[in-house]
Amino acid sequence: MTTCEIEMATRGQVNARRNYLMGLWAGRMLGMGDRELPGYVHEVMRSDFEEPGPGDVVRKVSRDLASRGRKISEEDVLKQLQVMEKSVRSELLSTD
């Protein structure tokens, strides 16, 4: 299997895991506890189905952070999302 074929086969997994991690990160930034966090993570993951690309996730997280006084720019949220995506890709493409 070529790298391109692996990339196409794992794209959905990468996005789902990236969004899961983004939800955890943002939820913790919002001060959510163990009871609230799973629901919020699910909301973040669902937000990715609004439009192609990560923009919908970035906007949701940015709005949520701003609504609780956490002023983090969309650019910084996008950078965090990109770091998470890179990490997830490394995990999925690594071999034992």
Regions found by a protein language model. Name each.
Residues M1-D96:
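A charge-rich, low-complexity, intrinsically flexible signal that marks solvent-exposed coils, linkers
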